[in-house]
Amino acid sequence: MKAHQIFQHASPALTRGIFHYLRTEQKEVYRTTVSTLAAGRKLRPVFVQKKTPEEQYAWLQKTVSMKGSDTVCEHLLQIWLLKAQRDLLVKFLDGVGIAHDGEGAADDLPDTIDADKLKATVQSLLAEYDPELVAVYLNTFQLQRLEGWDAIRDLIAADPRLQLGAPAPAKAEAGEAAAE
């Protein structure tokens, strides 16, 4: 899944949360994003900046869902995850045994990820975090290598809770998927 597709399939509440976080906590990133995306649409940034925050978020959602915005989308997701979702990143990296700086950034990514460690780690994350957040993280993490990791791709394919844009499973189904 490409970065713009993550935004296409994520819930409006999650994407609004991402944009709101960036607007309030990462102001320079937000301004640069608006300027870059506006220029890509042949608009002056002031066109977007004059809108209310909610109107800006709606414009951003529409714009980042377009195919040509992948680079910006991936950058936004990385910043949001590293800054706003640090605990999730650290738990994932620790769980699968990837060395990191203690804040969720890893310099050397492995060629393979142990499927059993991955499954146990993701089940733990799903018990603690919103499944959509875990799905966004896994799909974004997959973008860190050209072909991603087979173990992550297979796990996403096997568990509907990790599939962005898929209907949420009923509670009984979610319990069955966790038991597998």
What kind of feature is each model-predicted range?
Residues A3-I6, V64, V96-I98, L162-L164:
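Short, aromatic- and cysteine-enriched interfacial helices/patches
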Residues K2-Y30:
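Charged, amphipathic alpha-helical stretches
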Residues T24-R153:
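Acidic, low-complexity, intrinsically disordered interaction modules
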